[in-house]
Curated annotation (Swiss-Prot):
Keywords: Hydrolase, Magnesium
Functional note: dGTPase preferentially hydrolyzes dGTP over the other canonical NTPs.
Subunit structure: Homotetramer.
Gene Ontology annotations of biological process type: dGTP catabolic process; nucleobase-containing small molecule interconversion; pyrimidine deoxyribonucleoside salvage
SUPFAM superfamilies, alphabetized: HD-domain/PDEase-like
Catalytic activity of the protein: dGTP + H2O = 2'-deoxyguanosine + triphosphate + H(+)
Pfam families: HD
Name assigned to this protein: Deoxyguanosinetriphosphate triphosphohydrolase
Boundaries of every HD domain copy: 66-273
Cofactor: Mg(2+)
Entry's Gene Ontology molecular function annotations: cobalt ion binding; dGTPase activity; GTPase activity; identical protein binding; magnesium ion binding; manganese ion binding; single-stranded DNA binding
Family: Belongs to the dGTPase family. Type 1 subfamily.
């Protein structure tokens, strides 16, 4: 096991225009303050205020959006980070672990990773992801790329269809088809900060949001040693070279994770579990009394000193006995949140310290709050009650289905851009308006400048005389469409769909 030295992980250099001659703790901290400013002032963070947390298209400002959720995660992440550093200080291990002059950057990386953790999520959350992946799967059929004979390949894109005698190209076709059918919010977040927004963050800060380490083009089983870390796609083919450089800069082995990412993940787990239940009460899906009974029933028999008793029952009793003229709802959730944090944050911090050798190496194949403890059981309780009584509610399911239809419909509306031949689309990109393509010209104009420039830059770097050029061009064209639609807010996607379907002016 390598020696734990966080000076080898908290890399303050950047991909472009990296600061030179940095020596003091204050100078390093200023670099991470610059990261903080770039992140907080980015349009992608502002768009989170109109993206779904649980309830799409919600007009009640008391119900959480992705932005308010991310701010709560940021606070919990800071709390866990401070708890870890405090315990390491008590153990006199800060200097031994190379953290004595890096406590500020340690906290800042965690906080900003928490704020950014949902930055790549599409409109309508997981149903938006499913809509994008299903739409591309129906056209690219990545599963057929593994089958024989080649005549069984149902891919509707000629450039990506497998061909006899072209095995090196066929392997690239397989990778591209798999990659495009595995859109994922975490992978899109990496693409956003590096390729689309060009935020030029420090290597350590980007490492903090690389939650999953599986490439989106991965086919087959994942290694048992990394099955949790590779549970979902973490980055796309378009960012393969960047991630390879990131691993080198952060001393990460293949498919391993950056240490501070475990803290971000734990903060997210703690935050959304209570928040989803509070939002459900705000939405009148159930009353706070009904919620308490749901929690009590799901936990089952317990003794007075159990975690359920100390956290949930305690919150319930305090909220009922409060003599102040405040609502039971507000009081219950205040106590529930405080009790939950006071139990789970120290537990997550200690789990981080206890497993630090594996976490530092990036190979700890679990979440911090995923074990056989009562703390893990408490999180499962909150999640299970939400699944049973919130996510399955007819109003929630109706809005999710509408969101799925909106994203699928938008992809279908923009499909003519993917149907153009390579030469025709190249002409459209160069001229921006082509008379014989009136529909395609208008659709192309609607794409954002940022996304169009990302496409042009990527394609301009490709050798145009290479046999791989048509494959890569089509890949980046699909990415262009995924970038544009996934970057929409819920409300913009909803309005755009209705306008283009001529439902309203």
């Amino acid at each position: 096991m390598a020696q734990i030295d966080f000076r080898k992980k908290i890399n303050w250099h950047r991909r472009y225009r990296s600061p030179q001659g940095v020596k003091t703790e204050h100078e390093i901290l200023r670099i991470f303050e610059s990261d903080r400013g770039r992140i907080i002032n980015s349009p992608a963070i502002r768009r989170l205020q109109q993206k779904t947390q649980v309830f799409p298209l919600e007009r009640n400002a008391a119900v959480r959006t992705r932005l308010t959720h991310s701010m709560e995660v940021q606070q919990v992440g800071r709390y866990i980070a401070k708890e870890i550093l405090s315990r390491l200080k008590e153990l006199k291990l800060l200097e031994a672990y190379g953290l004595d002059e890096l406590t500020g950057p340690f906290e800042s990386i965690v906080e900003m990773s928490c704020l950014m953790h949902d930055i790549g999520n599409p409109p309508f959350g997981h149903f938006g992801e499913a809509a994008i992946n299903d739409w591309f799967r129906q056209r690219l059929h990545p599963e057929d790329a593994e089958s024989q004979p080649l005549t069984d390949d149902r891919c509707s894109v000629a450039a990506l269809r497998l061909r006899d005698g072209e095995e090196p190209l066929n392997e690239l076709r397989r990778k591209i088809r798999q990659d495009l059918c595995h859109f994922e919010g975490n992978a899109q977040g990496i693409r956003l900060v590096h390729t689309l927004m060009r935020m030029n963050l420090t290597w350590a800060q980007v490492g903090g949001i690389l939650k999953y380490t599986r490439p989106a083009w991965w086919r087959g089983e994942t290694p048992e040693t990394h099955h949790y870390l590779m549970k979902k796609p973490g980055y796309y083919l378009s960012e393969e070279a960047y991630i390879a450089r990131l691993r080198k800069e952060l001393n990460l082995a293949l498919y391993s994770r950056f240490p501070l990412t475990w803290i971000m993940e734990a903060a997210d787990d703690i935050s959304y579990c209570v928040a989803d239940l509070e939002d459900a009460v705000e939405k009148r899906i159930f009353t706070v009394e009904q919620l308490y009974h749901h929690l009590h029933e799901a936990w089952g028999q317990h003794e007075k000193g159990s975690l359920f008793s100390l956290v949930v029952e305690n919150a319930w009793e305090k909220s009922r006995s409060n003599s102040l003229s405040r609502s039971t709802e507000d009081q219950f959730f205040m106590y529930l949140r405080v009790n939950t944090l006071n139990k789970l944050v120290p537990y997550a911090a200690q789990r981080f310290i206890d497993n630090l050798p594996a976490i530092f190496a990036g190979t700890f194949n679990h979440a911090l709050l995923e074990d056989a403890s009562e703390c893990s059981d408490l999180l499962k309780l909150y999640k299970n009650v939400a699944v049973k009584h919130v996510f399955s509610h007819p109003d929630v399911e109706r809005l999710e289905l509408q969101g799925y239809r909106v994203i699928s419909g938008l992809l279908e509306i923009y499909r003519p851009l993917l149907s153009l031949s390579l030469s025709d689309f190249t002409e459209l990109v160069e001229k921006e308006r082509v008379k014989r393509f009136p529909i395609e010209s208008r659709l192309f104009h609607k794409l954002s400048t940022r996304h169009r420039l990302a496409y042009v830059e990527a394609v301009s770097k490709l050798p145009s005389d290479s046999p791989e050029f048509p494959l890569w061009e089509y890949y980046y064209r699909c990415r262009l469409l995924q970038d544009y639609i996934s970057g929409m807010t819920d409300l913009y996607a909803w309005d755009e769909y209705r306008r283009l379907m001529a439902v309203e002016q």
